[in-house]
């Protein structure tokens, strides 16, 4: 862990920066709270009585060891400590777009550069910021965050906000957040998140193969089926709206078409839920819209995943060589980075959305 004297900088680093003292203060105090209350997982296991959480924490340690041993992810104290929090999410990120565009607003700060979201430790603060942006006419989305990375500045603890997730989802989160610690490109949310998702997906595939557990395999296959349906729905809706927004139609007609597209999206989702037997994990996402901001938020995480997957394949699946290539790309200016990634991945196209 870095000295607490550096905490102000790290808070700016992990949150989507802001010039106000209030914003930085909530980031500093929120991060301190997580760190000072964290306990080593072995010590928690000695006294915990909840058998479900105990088994989950044992699994966390095994996944954490696998991440460094087999995936080449950072070997440090992250996810070897545990913090109990009294809320469903640790952070809430605010996303905003214009009403007829998917161009996500950016917030900038000195250390991490510019990112397409702004994070708060208190939901009420995130909702207040979203209301302020909505009053200006923006589409807004507030996304709950179960875990995040301080990019190696601190030893990120395992949080109660996701300890009860399915084992496959816990593995995803740990692999994803450790991938951020390994490398980070300033001012490029899509690059950073797409890279981390590609590591998460490859890591999960390898971890599952090592477990020889049919229940885990079924858990993964079911989750992937739901995720693929959701992503396809987002992709179809976004493609339809991008075509509409780029047309010569009047803004009034575009707004009407937008409303129709999102209503059709809701109907498709309800039909999908019936086919899933009532699985409702995406209800939170739909409850706030959907709108341009919520679609943009999804796309930020997966837009360039196919390019990173192609780059890994070009390296023969060798993760250390893949990481070296990605680090080299991260060091380039953003425009050059995008061209180099496209070339390095054999011209593989990026996803319009998830």
Residue ranges and their predicted role:
Residues 6-16:
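Bacterial N-terminal signal peptides
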Residues 35-49, 107-115, 288-290, 306:
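Acidic/histidine-rich, surface-exposed loop or edge segments in extracytoplasmic proteins
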Residues 1-4:
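Positively charged n-region of N-terminal signal peptides that target proteins for export
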Residues 17-39:
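Bacterial Sec signal peptide processing site at the extreme N-terminus
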Residues 62-227:
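Acidic/His-rich structured neighborhood in mature extracellular/periplasmic domains
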Residues 34, 53-60, 119-126, 163-172, ...:
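Solvent-exposed, acidic/flexible segments
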Residues 31-67:
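Amphipathic alpha-helical packing elements
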Residues 232-354:
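Pan-zinc metallopeptidase signature
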């Amino acid at each position: 862990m870095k000295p607490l004297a550096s905490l102000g900088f790290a808070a700016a680093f992990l949150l989507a920066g802001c010039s106000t003292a209030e914003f930085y203060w909530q980031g500093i105090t929120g991060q301190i709270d997580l760190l000072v209350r964290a306990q080593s997982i072995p010590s928690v296991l000695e006294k915990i009585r909840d058998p479900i959480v105990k088994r989950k924490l044992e699994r966390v340690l095994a996944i954490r060891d696998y991440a460094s041993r087999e995936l080449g992810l950072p070997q440090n104290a992250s996810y070897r400590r545990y913090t109990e929090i009294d809320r469903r999410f640790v952070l809430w990120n605010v996303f905003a777009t214009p009403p007829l565009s998917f161009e996500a607003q950016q917030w900038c700060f000195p250390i991490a550069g510019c990112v397409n979201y702004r994070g708060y430790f208190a939901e009420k603060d995130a909702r207040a910021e979203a209301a302020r942006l909505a009053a200006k006419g923006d589409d807004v989305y507030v996304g709950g965050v179960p875990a995040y990375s301080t990019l190696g500045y601190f030893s990120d603890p395992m949080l109660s906000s996701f300890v009860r997730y399915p084992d496959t989802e816990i593995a995803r989160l740990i692999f994803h957040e450790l991938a951020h610690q390994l490398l980070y490109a300033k001012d490029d949310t899509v690059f950073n998140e797409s890279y981390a998702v590609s590591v998460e997906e490859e890591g999960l595939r390898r971890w599952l193969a090592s477990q020889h557990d049919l229940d885990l395999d079924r858990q993964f296959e079911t989750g992937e089926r739901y995720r693929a349906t959701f992503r396809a729905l987002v992709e179809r809706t976004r493609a339809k709206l991008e075509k509409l927004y780029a047309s010569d139609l009047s803004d009034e007609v575009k707004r009407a078409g937008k409303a129709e597209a999102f209503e059709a999206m809701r109907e498709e989702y309800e039909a999908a839920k019936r086919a899933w037997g009532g699985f409702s994990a995406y209800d939170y996402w739909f409850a706030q819209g959907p709108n341009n901001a919520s679609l943009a938020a999804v796309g930020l995480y997966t837009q360039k995943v196919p390019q990173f997957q192609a780059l890994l394949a070009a390296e023969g699946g060798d993760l250390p060589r893949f990481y070296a290539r990605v680090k080299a790309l991260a060091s380039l200016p953003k425009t050059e980075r995008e061209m180099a990634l496209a070339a390095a991945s054999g011209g593989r196209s990026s996803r319009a959305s998830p």
